[in-house]
Amino acid sequence: MATHLFTSESVSEGHPDKIADQISDAVLDAILEQDPRARVACETYVKTGMVLVGGEVTTSAWVDIEELTRNTVKEIGYTHSDMGFDADSCAVLNAIGKQSPDINQGVDRASLEEQGAGDQGLMFGYASDETDVLMPAPITYSHRLVQKQAEVRKSGKLDWLRPDAKSQITFKYENDKPVGIDAVVLSTQHCDSVSTETVREAVMEEIIKPVLPSEWIDGNTRFHINPTGRFVIGGPMGDCGLTGRKIIVDTYGGMARHGGGAFSGKDPSKVDRSAAYAGRYVAKNIVAAGLAKRCEIQVSYAIGVAEPTSISIDTFGTGVVDEKTLVALVREHFDLRPYGLIQMLDLERPIYRPTAAYGHFGRDEFPWEATDKAQALKASL
């Protein structure tokens, strides 16, 4: 029997890098609401008392960057300088310019179907049958821990919790199936007046136990709750935050490969984002159809060219048909040209802000999580 350990981490919506991601996607959504075919590449930097929003935008829309930024920070929960950041008093700097016409001429076409890719690059999609959402268990439960932290914090149940938090889970695998949890790490920001003992006890009872299945926990499972003992200074006061710095948290927790491109702040003409979503859609439908237990797809593009330069699939020995057959099925049932996948997943609309925390995949509310092609894939064999 083959055994191994695998670890993934997640971070909360109050983590500095995630604040940046959420601001970038809030700007994107506000623009897409007015101008669905806008070109947006929005980057955000946050540090003590300051938010810098920059990038390139081509649009007919007008949005109030300062108001959007403050509202986003407020919704996350940074409402007082005692927390290390205050939505009402932080400086908001706007450094947004226009998209280069050299890029634009390679993307826009008279025929929408021939729209070229916004850049070269390679993107991966992945799915696995090890959880109900067809995602790897380590990243799925790491996300659920920090989501629970936010839920408990916002409900007021533990009113001393603060927005910044991180989680990490090490799973035990036997024959590529998760069978238990070896270690759990959860660090959460808290107010100055609460003791470390209180934090550890409450986090275990209110966050960890309600989230992690008891059958995966045993006497050998190790728990590290605020292992440094104190986490009062957090958020942008503790670390600066930058859009696109949590690409493994955003995807599969390291279980699958990554092409390197970040998602947040990018409109769907950027294949870094849209093709990664389409890759997840393809891989999930292949697994949902029972054609493989695990599936990873790679798609690549050239700037200004509509057709993908390559499509390849790896099922890690779990496929019921060979990978060449799967690639042929993908070409038959999925349009992976930039505009084709935008239409397939209905991406030209303001749906991106919620993706910017707790992972872009494994959440049923997003269109790339649908398994509506599974039956057709199965029937094609």
Swiss-Prot record:
Pfam families: S-AdoMet_synt_C (PF02773), S-AdoMet_synt_M (PF02772), S-AdoMet_synt_N (PF00438). Keywords: ATP-binding, Cytoplasm, Magnesium, Metal-binding, Nucleotide-binding, One-carbon metabolism, Potassium, Transferase. It is an enzyme of class 2 (transferase). Pathway: Amino-acid biosynthesis; S-adenosyl-L-methionine biosynthesis; S-adenosyl-L-methionine from L-methionine: step 1/1. GO terms for molecular function: ATP binding; magnesium ion binding; methionine adenosyltransferase activity. K(+) binds at residue 43. Mg(2+) binds at residue 17. Its EC number is 2.5.1.6. It catalyses: L-methionine + ATP + H2O = S-adenosyl-L-methionine + phosphate + diphosphate. Residues 99-109 are annotated as: Flexible loop. Disulfide bonds: none annotated. It is found in: Cytoplasm. Catalyzes the formation of S-adenosylmethionine (AdoMet) from methionine and ATP. The overall synthetic reaction is composed of two sequential steps, AdoMet formation and the subsequent tripolyphosphate hydrolysis which occurs prior to release of AdoMet from the enzyme. HAMAP family: S_AdoMet_synth1 (MF_00086). Belongs to the AdoMet synthase family. This is S-adenosylmethionine synthase.
